[in-house]
Swiss-Prot record:
It comes from Suid herpesvirus 1 (strain Kaplan). This is Tegument protein UL51. Residues 195-209 have a biased composition (Acidic residues). It is found in: Virion tegument; Host cytoplasm; Host Golgi apparatus. InterPro entries: Herpes_UL51.
């Protein structure tokens, strides 16, 4: 009781409210991890100047380490070659997509925190707290990542479907060609009349056959005077 009274008179704060600066080695290690991502490096003197800056540095350090871990996972997954196992390729593609989304979310939250340095912004603290809770869990739920993506304004990128490699000795399947459209056949134009007549005459068998009988001699005609006399004799 007396200790509390003396502390109030002397202006000392309680142990729970006292600020203990972090170790300088740990502080510089966090700065080294964070300055790799930030567009402008931070100095240790600027961070140690206030408790708020040190608190934000600790949060940014966690986000930066998670971002770098996701980048290493993406590098390892990028070395995977497509195999004949569809299940394995689908799992690798899903892990790569989730790691990319988590890395983008951490980087966006980190940039949001960096841009809000020097200003008291409750929304930024809420975003960073949510990102820290998400990355601290052993099993990251991608629905939480989707919420952060919508909050931070990140566009969802579609990953291409994994391409199954063709077995050795077999070529890729040839894509089916579209069937040609059926076109109505145009009727042939009729031949000219002269050519048609020639064709018909040439097709007759009697025109090509030679005559079997000799031609008849012309009949003899009597003179008109003899014919008249013969007619009068018949009348008598």
């Amino acid at each position: 009781m007396l200790g509390g009274i003396f502390s109030g008179w002397c202006g000392r704060r309680g142990r729970g409210r006292a600020y203990e600066p972090p170790d300088e080695l740990r502080l510089r290690e966090s700065l080294a991890v964070l300055n790799v991502i930030l567009p402008a490096p931070l100095a240790a003197e600027d961070v140690m100047a206030s408790a708020e800056a040190a608190r934000r540095l600790a949060r940014a350090d966690t986000l930066a380490r998670t971002y770098q871990a996701c980048q290493r996972n993406l590098e390892c997954l990028a070395r995977h070659e497509a195999s004949g196992d569809d299940g394995l390729d689908a799992v690798v593609a899903a892990h790569a997509a989730n790691a990319r989304r988590l890395a983008d979310t951490c980087l966006a939250a980190l940039m949001h925190l960096y841009l809000s340095v020097g200003a008291v912004d409750a929304d930024t603290d809420d975003l960073v707290e949510q990102a820290l809770r998400m990355t601290a869990e052993s099993n990251v739920v991608m629905s939480d990542v989707a919420v952060l993506e919508r909050t931070l304004g990140l566009a969802r990128r579609r990953q291409p479907a994994p391409v199954r490699a063709a077995p050795a000795g077999l070529g890729l399947p040839v894509p089916a060609q579209p069937a040609p459209r059926a076109t109505a056949a145009r009727p042939a134009p009729p031949p000219p009349p002269e050519e048609a007549g020639e064709d018909e005459e040439g097709d007759r068998p009697e025109d090509d056959a030679a005559p079997l009988l000799p031609p008849r001699a012309p009949a003899k005609t009597r003179p008109p005077e003899k014919a008249r006399r013969l007619a009068e004799a018949c009348k008598m």
